[in-house]
Regions:
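Bacterial Sec-dependent N-terminal signal peptides
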Residues: 1-17, 240-244
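Short loop/turn motifs that connect adjacent beta-strands in outer-membrane beta-barrel proteins
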Residues: 15-24, 51-56, 100-110, 161-167
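Transmembrane beta-strand segments that form the barrel wall of outer-membrane beta-barrel proteins
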Residues: 21-42, 56-64
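Transmembrane beta-strands of outer-membrane beta-barrel proteins
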Residues: 25-29, 55-61, 91, 109-117, ...
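Extracellular/periplasm-exposed beta-strand and loop segments of Gram-negative cell-envelope proteins
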Residues: 30-34, 66-90, 120-148, 176-231, ...
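Outer-membrane beta-barrel "beta-signal"
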Residues: 92, 96, 230-244
Length: 244
């Protein structure tokens, strides 16, 4: 009996030790945003496994920005420079339910579903040379702001390698988004001059910004310099992580 009691105590101690070593935390770095928006987009994340060991919450925060417009030039307008004070950030959060019946391994490894919320702000300053109808030229600065709120439901999968390294993929994340998009100018411009710059901005963003034609009413933006729309939203993300 004494031997059996000793074995039970040893087994219990080992289980407790395993429990203590269970890794509840993961830090992530988003590798999707830099591919879409450029190297200035750096978003970090943190995931915490809850006591149930089948649910977790995660938060992400970081810097982002509009993609580089590249060269824009025609007979009456020339894009001179992207100014230094580029602004943009991302904040998001989700609550994950790991599907134990679908997964061979404990969370946070395997299939998960859950709700999410994200907020993105993009700010962009540019300098332009515009040619007037009388042949004179003027230097104009423009500012573009985009605020995006999205709420939705996601489906994803997280791989774990060698107990420490994770690859987290939000594969499907449909939702509803509100998009507030505005442009402003440093000078008092004629309607024709504004129209030229707005058309150039619209064309550049349509080419460089994913989903631009869906989230922005382009005709309204080119006419008024602003647009506010509620429409479909989406979340897709790949992250590399380290568990501890």
């Amino acid at each position: 009996m004494m031997i059996l009691s000793g074995l039970l105590q040893t087994a219990s101690a080992q289980e407790t030790k395993k429990e203590e070593k269970f890794r509840k935390n993961t830090v992530h770095i988003n590798i999707t945003n830099p591919l879409i928006f450029g190297s200035g987009s750096i978003v970090l994340g943190y995931e915490r496994l809850l006591k149930s060991k089948k649910h977790s919450f995660s938060i992400n925060i970081g810097l982002t920005s509009f993609p580089d417009f590249g060269l824009i030039e025609n007979d009456s307008l020339k894009h001179l420079a992207k100014l230094k004070d580029q602004k943009g950030f991302n904040v998001s959060a989700d609550y994950r339910f790991y599907l134990l019946k679908e997964n061979k391994h404990p969370a946070p490894r395997g299939v998960y579903i859950g709700p999410y919320y994200s907020y993105n702000y993009f700010g962009n300053h540019n300098s332009w040379e515009i040619k007037n109808s009388n042949g004179s030229t003027a230097i104009v600065e423009s500012e573009v702001k985009l605020n995006v709120h999205t709420i939705g439901f996601e489906f994803g999968y997280q791989f774990v390698f060698r107990d420490r390294i994770s690859l987290d993929m939000v594969l499907l994340g449909p939702g509803v988004g509100t998009y507030d998009f505005k442009a402003g100018f440093s000078n008092n411009l004629s309607d024709a001059a504004k129209q030229k710059i707005l058309e150039a901005l619209d064309g550049a963003l349509a080419e460089k910004f994913p989903g631009y034609g869906i989230i922005v009413n382009e005709e309204e933006f080119k006419r008024k310099g602003s647009t506010d729309r509620t429409t479909i939203g989406y979340r897709y993300m790949v992250q590399l992580g380290f568990r501890f």
